[in-house]
Amino acid sequence: MGTINSIIKGAEPIFIKGNEIGLLISHGFMGTPQSVRFIGEQLANLGYTILAPRLSGHGTDYYDLEKCHYDDWFASLENGYQKLKKYCTDIFIIGQSMGGTLSLWLAKKNPEIAGIMLINAALTIPSLEHLQNLSSPRYIDEDHPDIKDQSVYEITYKKAPIHAIHELQKLMDRTPAILKSIKCPILGIKSAIDHVVPPQNTDFILANIESKNKQLIVLENSYHVASMDFDKMTIVNSCHQFVQDLLHQKKQARIE
């Protein structure tokens, strides 16, 4: 899906070349790479190669988002994965909200992925359920991003196209059925209080995914957009530890 409008300043994709361990980071619905910039840069400082693509229709104008199907968002993430494969021997995925949902699909399609880290991954968004079968209004007003730290500004759209909401709902509705086919290690990160995606979404994913290596982190001082909130360094540290533990296990298995 092509973009006809220019990219909002600050919403550009992020690529930082580091070592042979790649971290592909996906923002969520209506968000941009800006929402994951902090965690990406912090992880890059630890040596990783970082790529945070801009999902199709995001970071430009909501008219662009209206033209997208969820396959377009997945294609944006998958293209990022293919790019990272040129530089990296091991690739891990970090996905926030809808980015977490897309990460599950990427892991299903690419079982060689070393592990996934999901931040408030979305399977249900109760506040949007009343729009499921409506064709109007064409756009709805978007609330302020769900961030506890009031000093934070997230780049997003002022309106959400109802067509894009329907595509998001389709993606979420179809995701539970694939969980049994995903076996890579998973770190589920959820905010204790999330006004957009119920924290139980993460519990459901961990309970139903086929992965043997499952871990859970609960953020006590952040809301939905946790990568920009008070616990953002907890996310960085938890993801770093998760990756390092898996790399150590892989190294030990080779020795044995």
PLM region spans:
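Short beta-strand/loop motif that positions the catalytic acidic residue
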Residues: 182, 188-190, 194
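Catalytic active-site module of serine/aspartate enzymes centered on a nucleophile-bearing elbow/loop
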Residues: 221-256
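Gly/Ala-rich beta-loop-alpha elbow adjacent to hydrolase catalytic centers
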Residues: 95-99, 103
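Short alpha-helix in the alpha/beta-hydrolase fold that links the catalytic acid
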Residues: 39, 184, 198-207
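Catalytic histidine neighborhood in serine/cysteine hydrolases
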Residues: 203, 207-225
